[in-house]
């Protein structure tokens, strides 16, 4: 596996320069674009990594999975009364579909859906940002994980579209908390700073029937883990989920920080990072690396 990861990074490195960093979030626009890392965490506890796998980056929308898992833990099936688990086929920050469907987001991985999940969690936790941070620390076994306040503040200063989604949902009585408070928590979640190894470990429970080896806790039931994986497979890469399924064939979740996490059920969790994005907001080189890895070891679930 180690030789394979090194080989794959060498093969995809020439693609660097073809994408663009997420400069609409000023703090992310400062990230050096030519970085590339990958990590694989097996269910047997082995970790393999290559490239810039130990360089921390902003996880952004990857955090939506952690938020969803927290909500499932404390509210179970009730959460689906306020949002769906269908693909949207729209950009992740679209307001058109949200208006048309009366403030009920299609799934928890578009921005509106993630805001509903944060609204649900906000009512359950006294300190939502700290609760999220501590949860992620347990999942990856790294007590040093923190949220980058510079990134969170940068996103909050450019919150208009997310605020619009929240207020639109509030007009349909599908958003109950204080919009500004929920937005601050949401951006702190997105601004969590982790590296590929951290994220591969943190997502290990989804490859292991909901069991986290680091903390020894059953994070989700096996059935719930399967359900989360299914939503990742259909909605985890914005409006490019179909292309990811075609090319990689695994449940995945991306973020505009350039990270992509993929789950190989019963076998491993993988994280790749390259900050240059394609037109859909997903890591251009990261997707190419995952496509090669999945093909070489026959990991597609299809």
Curated annotation (Swiss-Prot):
Sample GO molecular function, one term: glutaminase activity
Tell me yes or no: is Hydrolase among this UniProt entry's keywords. Answer: yes
Coiled coil located at which positions? none
What the entry lists under InterPro entries is as follows: Beta-lactam/transpept-like (IPR012338), Glutaminase (IPR015868)
Q: Which reaction does it catalyse?
A: L-glutamine + H2O = L-glutamate + NH4(+)
Chain positions recorded as substrate binding sites: 61, 111, 155, 162, 186, 238, 256
Q: What is its EC number?
A: 3.5.1.2
Family statement drawn from the similarity comment of this UniProt entry = Belongs to the glutaminase family.
The cross-references to NCBIfam families, in alphabetical order and at most eight, read:
Gln_ase, PRK00971.1-1, PRK00971.1-2
Q: What is this protein called?
A: Glutaminase
Q: Native species of this protein?
A: Pseudomonas syringae pv. syringae (strain B728a)
Quote the gene name from the UniProt entry: glsA
């Amino acid at each position: 596996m180690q030789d394979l990861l090194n080989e794959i990074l060498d093969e995809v490195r020439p693609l660097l320069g073809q994408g663009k960093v997420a400069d609409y979030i000023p703090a992310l626009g400062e990230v050096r674009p030519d970085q590339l890392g990958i990590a694989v965490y097996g269910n047997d506890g082995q970790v393999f990594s290559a490239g810039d796998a130990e360089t921390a980056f902003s996880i952004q929308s990857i955090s939506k999975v952690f938020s969803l898992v927290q909500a499932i833990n404390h509210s179970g099936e009730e959460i689906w009364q306020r949002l769906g688990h269908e693909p949207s086929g729209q950009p992740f920050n679209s307001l058109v579909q949200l208006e048309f469907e009366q403030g009920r987001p299609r799934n928890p991985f578009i921005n509106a859906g993630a805001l509903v999940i944060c609204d649900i969690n906000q009512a359950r936790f006294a300190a939502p940002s700290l609760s999220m941070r501590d949860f992620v620390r347990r999942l990856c076994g790294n007590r040093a994980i923190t949220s980058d306040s510079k990134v969170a503040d940068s996103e909050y200063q450019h919150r208009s579209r997310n605020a619009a989604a929240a207020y639109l949902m509030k007009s349909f009585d599908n958003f109950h908390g204080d919009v500004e408070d929920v937005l601050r928590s949401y951006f702190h979640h997105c601004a969590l700073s982790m590296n590929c190894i951290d994220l591969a470990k943190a997502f290990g429970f989804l490859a292991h029937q909901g069991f986290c080896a680091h903390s020894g806790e059953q994070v989700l039931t096996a059935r719930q883990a399967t359900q989360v994986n299914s939503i990742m497979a259909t909605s985890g890469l914005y409006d490019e989920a179909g292309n990811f399924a075609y090319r990689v064939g695994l449940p995945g979740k991306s973020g505009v920080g350039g990270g992509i996490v993929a789950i190989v059920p019963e076998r491993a969790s993988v994280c790749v990072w390259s900050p240059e994005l394609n037109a859909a907001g997903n890591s251009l080189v990261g997707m190419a690396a995952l496509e090669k890895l999945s093909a070489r070891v026959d990991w597609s679930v299809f």
